[in-house]
Every structure is written in C-alpha cells, then in structure tokens.
Amino acid sequence: MGQAKYWHPYQMRSARLILVEDDAFTRATLGDALILQGFDVKARVATAAEALAAQAEHAPQVAVLDLDLGIGPTGIDVAIALRNKNPQIGIVFLTTYKDPRLIESNLPTLPEGAIYLNKLEMTSTSAIAGQVSSAMMKPLVRRSFPWVRNSPLSALSTLQIEIMKEIAEGASTSEIARSRGVSEQAIDKSISRISKHLGLPKSADSHQRVQIVRAFFENKGQGI
C-alpha cells in the first residue's frame, strides 16, 4: 500500500478533479457545484475513453464517477483503469444504486479506498466535497461500503440479485427456471427467500413479484 500524501486544506479544495457522468444535466450541475466548493474541475466527461484521455491530459488527483455509464464500461471499470495509471488517485462513486450488483452481477471489486455515495442520500454539495477531500487525502484507506453496513440487499447472494433483476425485467418463474436449468420449485424458494431478506410481507405470488420489482427499482434509485 502506498504512503498517503499530506494535503494542506487549501490544496484539497484546489485539487485537480475529473467528473465522469453520462447524464448531461448532472454532469453540468455537479461540475459547477464542485467548482463552487473550490475544486479545480479539469474535465467533465461521459465515457470511459473520455475519462482516460482526461487523465492523460490533466493528471487529476481525484475522480468523481457515476456507477452506471450506459452501454459499455461501468464506473468501476473506469476507476480501475484510472488507478492502473495512477495508484494514488482518489476515487469517489456518486450513484443512485444502493448496491452495484444491481447493474451487473459479475462486476469487479471496487478499487481499494474508494468512497461510495448515494446521490439520493446526499443533502448538500459541501457534504460531497468533504467526501471528495477524504478520498484524496487517504486514497487507499480501507473503507466499508453502505450496502455491506445497513442495506437489506447485503443479505442477498449474487444469485438472488440476478433472479431479482430477471423478475424486474418481466421474466416468469418458468422462464427463469429454464434459463438456469433448475426446477420452478427451486426458483419459487429463491423468490420467497428474497422477499424475506427484503422484509416484504407475505402475499400471493403475483403481488409478491410486484413488490420485488418495486424494491429492485427503488434500490436503483428509480422508484415506481
């Protein structure tokens, strides 16, 4: 593990930063907010290729990334690539997803020292700025993640997350069972366990599936 560099408070708030966010409105408003907080926002980009080009041009000290960048590499993939170029770059994820497995079940592990923030839980840009400063001051410190600490999703296995996602995409029990080469009874048991872990009330199968779909989108930050 590399030695953390000491940053003077003034240096922290004038740090070179790149913002990786595929939503144009969020990219513009968050970038402006971080500038007002004193950061030197060198680039606001939407894709992995643009992020790596911005790193090569500006040598940022910290990167703020969305998790879901649309089709192609995720924010985690981008963060890993940034770290490969600069092992000391601070990494902050700012996303609506309460658990990254809701994007893909086989995502790589978050880079060591990364800070994971939920957009819907942040109350001010100064709170975001404080976390960005922390990521830059101690880029490799071991951190716990929110879905591990206090989310009902933490009790779900990767397989259960996958089944939850398939239900949300409209797959029937028989379709899920067929695609996985198991019995419908096995999938029914998995659905019951998912409901129990999420704290959903017992109900008829159709209503149970509706509740799982609602929980899936709520945990993505896209409530229905």
Model-predicted regions and their roles:
Residues 195-224:
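Basic, Lys/Arg-enriched C-terminal extension of HTH/homeodomain DNA-binding domains
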Residues 64-81, 98:
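Conserved phosphotransfer microenvironments
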Residues 74-88, 104-108:
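Short amphipathic alpha-helix used as the core "switch/output" element in two-component signaling
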Residues 1-16, 148, 221-224:
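Non-catalytic signal-transmission and effector/linker regions of two-component phosphorelay proteins
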Residues 145-192:
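Helix-turn-helix DNA-binding segment
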Residues 31, 44-62:
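Acidic, metal-coordinating helix/loop segments flanking the phosphotransfer/catalytic sites
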Residues 23-43:
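Two-component/phosphorelay signaling modules centered on CheY-like receiver
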